[in-house]
Amino acid sequence: MMLEHVLVLSAYLFSIGIYGLITSRNMVRALMCLELILNAVNLNFVTFSDFFDSRQLKGNIFSIFVIAIAAAEAAIGPAIVSAIYRNRKSIHINQSNLLNK
């Protein structure tokens, strides 16, 4: 694939993730949009690493690091959401003001 096609795809994924993160009122949907943003960033890292210097794997290694961070976020995020649901009986972002109690 050409560089422009991959960058346009990554920009679309990033834009969809940002739009979903801004407009979503559901915490689970916000976590999914955050994962979409991280995957778009990973696609950029791998693409630029392959396009500019294919012998050095700095972009690929950094992409694996971001995948590890996303895996930790995917493990901890739903646990936090379930704890908030248990205490507040809602997973909507507007209804869960954690500073009041």
Swiss-Prot record:
Translocase in keyword set: yes
Enzyme class: translocase
Protein keywords: Chloroplast, Membrane, NAD, NADP, Plastid, Plastoquinone, Quinone, Thylakoid, Translocase, Transmembrane, Transmembrane helix, Transport
A GO term from the CC aspect: chloroplast thylakoid membrane
Compartments where found: Plastid, Chloroplast thylakoid membrane
Reactions mediated catalytically: a plastoquinone + NADH + (n+1) H(+)(in) = a plastoquinol + NAD(+) + n H(+)(out); a plastoquinone + NADPH + (n+1) H(+)(in) = a plastoquinol + NADP(+) + n H(+)(out)
InterPro entries: NADH_UbQ_OxRdtase_chain4L/K, NUOK/Mnh_C1-like
Topology of this chain in the membrane: Multi-pass membrane protein
Keyword NADP recorded: yes
MF GO annotations: oxidoreductase activity, acting on NAD(P)H, quinone or similar compound as acceptor; quinone binding
Top-rank taxon, per record: Eukaryota
Subunit and partners: NDH is composed of at least 16 different subunits, 5 of which are encoded in the nucleus.
Protein name: NAD(P)H-quinone oxidoreductase subunit 4L, chloroplastic
Record organism: Manihot esculenta
Gene: ndhE
